[in-house]
């Protein structure tokens, strides 16, 4: 079962927490859920160059707080914060509520599964050999502290007539171990031969305490230690 299920959903409430953190009654729930989906789709498309790792949405008391985890926050903020203000206004229109926007820098994109998957997909679109892209990602992740990584690419790899799946793994990736801190990300590469899917699993160690926020807190501490300074964060109200 651990081999097939989404590793993040499998660990929700154990050492991972939700990316949408709000409660609503039955009348509003469907509308707010669709708003979340639209916000994420819009940000992923609009800020594709910024390397979006995760979008966290909170809704405290008729407001909306959106936290964007990005590898290149400068592209979102813009010169003197002009771009982030435009983005905040657009999100306010989409939600019909006051929106607060936070930008958090991901200091180690090489060990973030979503960013690794996006990087490999972009290389496939540029016709980089898939084996070279996968090996380079594996080596970078292991060098920067990952305890294990697994990458799969599926589709008409290299323009082959028949689609197939290729994968690489290095280190340990214990998918059945619930205390394991496993990050998971996917991406799609739109090549001339069709769409190729990329999946990435990264094992970052074990979390022994039973705390849904443990994984997020641990990632922040790791970023601060590895980045040589305090966490870079921009908040715009």
UniProtKB/Swiss-Prot annotation:
The keyword Membrane does not apply. It holds the Pfam family Ribosomal_S3_C. This is Small ribosomal subunit protein uS3. Keywords: Ribonucleoprotein, Ribosomal protein, RNA-binding, rRNA-binding. GO terms for molecular function: mRNA binding; rRNA binding; structural constituent of ribosome. Residues 39-107 form the KH type-2 domain. Belongs to the universal ribosomal protein uS3 family. One of its GO terms (cellular component) is cytosolic small ribosomal subunit. One of its GO terms (biological process) is translation. InterPro entries: KH_dom, KH_dom-like_a/b, KH_dom_type_2, KH_sf_prok-type, Ribosomal_S3_C_sf, Ribosomal_uS3_bac-typ, Ribosomal_uS3_C, Ribosomal_uS3_CS. The keyword Secreted does not apply. NCBIfam families: rpsC_bact. Binds the lower part of the 30S subunit head. Binds mRNA in the 70S ribosome, positioning it for translation. Residues 213-237 are annotated as: Disordered. It comes from Sinorhizobium medicae (strain WSM419). PANTHER family: 30S/40S RIBOSOMAL PROTEIN S3, SMALL RIBOSOMAL SUBUNIT PROTEIN US3C. The lineage of its organism: Bacteria, Pseudomonadati, Pseudomonadota, Alphaproteobacteria, Hyphomicrobiales. Disulfide bonds: none annotated.
